[in-house]
Regions:
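Helix-biased detector of long, well-ordered alpha-helical tracts
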Residues: 1-209
């Protein structure tokens, strides 16, 4: 069993998605050490305002994905932000986006965002758009409210570990993404709010997307 666990640990450490997280260390090099409430944050940053914990976060979508599937990239911009807010124990409030590129790319990006935002019942309230003939780019940013913010840094030995993931769906052939919209559909709006409910009730104390 110990050998199996050791092999699993090494496989996880070698995964490209995990190795890419090491680049986050650059933020600490530039901005210095800070607690997770003040930022740089965890999956999001917690901003205290008049006694309310607001959670903000952002995601830049892989440029190759934006160019290859702009509609899917728009959907991903919504999903990734809501997943980050959920991991912070936040109820999603709103999204904004920044999009650049030719109209033929920008339009399906926005259509994908509109569809996904409707599916999750979270409004896209604004952003920035620049029409250009250059390479397209897409980033989006989420705002949420947390009764009891969560952080990966609150994890400790002896806690019960639960993997909260959707198993309904199929892996894409072209990019390492696992959409479940067709299979899960209308239940996703509730799914993305489960951790906020758990955090508010006090039975979730740490999380990581």
């Amino acid at each position: 069993m110990a050998e199996d666990i050791g092999a699993l640990v090494e496989a996880v450490r070698a995964h490209p998605g995990v190795r890419a997280k090491a680049e986050i260390g650059l933020v600490r090099e530039v901005f210095g050490e800070s607690d997770w409430l003040a930022g740089p944050g965890d999956d999001g940053a917690v901003v205290m305002h008049e006694g309310m914990a607001l959670v903000v976060g952002g995601e830049a979508i892989l440029p190759a994905f934006v160019a290859a599937d702009p509609y899917g990239a728009g959907v991903a911009a919504v999903t990734t932000n809501l997943n980050d807010l959920a991991a912070m124990g936040a109820w999603p409030l709103a999204l904004v986006d920044t999009v650049t590129g030719p109209r033929a790319v920008v339009r399906p990006v926005l259509e994908g965002m509109r569809w996904a935002a409707g599916l999750y019942d979270v409004p896209v309230v604004g952003g920035h758009l620049t029409g250009t003939t250059g390479a397209p780019s897409l980033s989006a940013f989420g705002l949420g409210r947390a009764d009891r913010p969560l952080s990966a840094r609150a994890a400790a030995p002896g806690q019960s570990l639960v993997v909260a993931a959707c198993l309904d769906g199929q892996m894409r052939a072209d990019f390492p993404f696992f959409p479940s919209f067709d299979e899960r559909g209308g239940r996703l709006a509730g799914d993305v709010r489960l951790l906020a409910e758990g955090a508010s009730a006090g039975w979730v104390v740490a999380a990581k997307d």
